[in-house]
Amino acid sequence: AQNKGSDDCGGFLKNYSGWISYYKALTTNCVWTIEMKPGHKIILQILPLNLTCGKEYLEVRDQRAGPDNFLKVCGGTGFVYQSSHNVATVKYSRDSHHPASSFNVYFYGIPQGAKA
C-alpha cells in the first residue's frame, strides 16, 4: 500500500494499514479502494494538503453509507475520516493540464465498536 511517488494510479488495498501518496503518472483520476475484514471500519488520516483548489482535489467516500457520505478537500491542516463499514475509497482528481501535486493519506483498520 505504499505508493509514495510511484506511477501507481489507484488500486485495491487490503492491508491492515498503509499509505496512499502522490503519483507521477499522467492519469487525471485515480481511485484507491481500501477493504478491511468484515466487522472493521477504516480510519483515514489526510496529512496537511496544499492542492490547487479548482484544479485538483481528494475525495474520500464511505462505500456503504450512501452517495452523500463523502469528504472532498483540496487544502487544510489535515483531516481524519472514519468510515462506517469496512470499505472506503480515496480518489485524486485533477485537470488534465495541471501538474500533479503531492499528498499523503495514512489508513488503518479498527474493530467496528472501537474508537479511533
UniProtKB/Swiss-Prot annotation:
SMART domains on file: CUB (SM00042)
GO MF: heparin binding
SUPFAM superfamilies linked to this entry: Spermadhesin, CUB domain (SSF49854)
Any Gene Ontology biological process: single fertilization
Residue(s) carrying Methylhistidine: H85
Post-translational modifications reported in the UniProt record: The residue at position 85 was identified as a methylhistidine by mass spectrometry.
Annotated glycan sites: N50
CUB domain ranges (all copies): 9-110
InterPro entries membership: CUB_dom (IPR000859), Sperma_CUB_dom_sf (IPR035914), Spermadhesin (IPR000124)
Subcellular location: Secreted
Cysteine pairs bridged by disulfides in the record: C9-C30, C53-C74
UniProt keyword terms in alphabetical order: Disulfide bond, Fertilization, Glycoprotein, Heparin-binding, Methylation, Secreted
GO annotations of cellular component type: extracellular region
Protein family (similarity comment): Belongs to the spermadhesin family.
Protein's job: AQN proteins mediate the binding of boar spermatozoa to component(s) of the egg's zona pellucida by a carbohydrate-binding mechanism. AQN proteins are secretory components of the male accessory glands being coated to the sperm surface at the time of ejaculation. They possess as well heparin-, serine-protease-inhibitor-binding capability.
Stated name of the protein: Carbohydrate-binding protein AQN-3
